[in-house]
Curated annotation (Swiss-Prot):
UniProt cross-references to InterPro entries, sorted A to Z: RTRAF
Organism this protein belongs to: Caenorhabditis elegans
PANTHER family from the UniProt entry: CLE
GO biological-process terms attached to the record: tRNA splicing, via endonucleolytic cleavage and ligation
Name recorded for this polypeptide: Uncharacterized protein E02H1.5
An annotated Gene Ontology molecular function: RNA binding
GO CC, any one term: tRNA-splicing ligase complex
Amino acid sequence: MSRRKLRAVEYDRDYINFDDDNEIRRLIVTVEEAHLKCRDQNWSAQMLDEQDVAKWTVELEKYFTEFGAPSGCSRAAAIDYVLNAAVQKIYEQKGGDTELCSSRLREQAEKVLEAHRDSQNPLNRLDYSSPNFAENARALCSILGISAHHPDPKVLMKAACLYIAENLGDDVIAEETEEVLKNKKTLNINAFPIGMQAPKNGAVHFSARLLRLICLRQLRVVSRMINETLVEIQNLTMDMSKRADLKQVQYGR
């Protein structure tokens, strides 16, 4: 008996303790109710509630025999016969075992890939197995600030796509742009003097105010350069040592 069979019958555990009679009864009842359905509705409850070991043991052996388990075989082998019957019934209900084999699933995956190969999505035309794709996927994650240490480049590309969809979508950008424009500080160009009589010509008036702003900006740049120069001169001429009796900076002699 394998864990795959337990998963196939949708059992909530991947192991069975064959020394625990209650666990064996629980498994058989679960498989019976979910898949096999060879007994009436009261059989499962009676099986779980039966306290007489001899009675439920006889009923369990009879149940095993119906699914081909030979007399005297171990509990593990008998349960395996029941699981095989349940798995076979699941396959039959889903269209036969050929519909669930690996070759069939591979063919279906190839058909889906072929159907989407020529679509408008450019991701469908990428070669996910090429070294160039792996390198570009890591570079994209680095640009976006995502960790690029995962060994699978397809996982990196998926992470990048999710990040872009959640943070760089059109709706997100539009919302951020609206927020920036809402909080943007603007200057009324008519709200400051220009130091001269305002020209009557509107174009000349507007140009004069722009030149005034440019002049103010240049004055600020020059002022900053002067301050930086003074700081450099002070760093070269000052002696930062202090005497014990004088709490001031001593300039070089």
